[in-house]
Amino acid sequence: MKELAPGIVVFENVFPNSMEYITRIEEQGISWRPAEVLVNEEEYQSGTNTKARDTDLIMLPHHDSQEIGTLAELTKEFHNNLKPCLDQYMATYFAKIEKFENPQLLRYGKEQQFHDHIDDHPFFTRRISLTYYLNEDYEGGDVEFGRYGLRFRAKK
């Protein structure tokens, strides 16, 4: 675990065979859809807003799900590979996870982006957010924490 700033850490090579799942998803023709963002805070409505977030998404099942198939296998292996990292993070920062949201598999094409945003929100309180890169051979895609003046290129 490498700390980049208070509470912002990097783990590398946590899920070495992750690209096998991407290959299977592509071979099976599993559909990607446009990712959504909160578009009306007062009524808690989500929708597509490509000016804020322009990316493709596959929603994965929860790691406790009884579903079967490629996406369920990916979720379970993802969770099993990352759980030791989360445990180490929680022990280091005295953090606690009360529930896991379903993971999202995101795909960014050329010119796609997710602008500056905060993951914590009154409707969906997030104390720990996790980003995992399934590959490293891409252009752009730096992660930036503007409040810390921190920008880095993630590795899988």
Question: Where would I find each of the regions flagged by the language model?
Answer:
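Non-heme Fe(II)/2-oxoglutarate
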Residues: 1-90
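Catalytic core of non-heme Fe(II) oxygenases with the double-stranded beta-helix
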Residues: 68-156
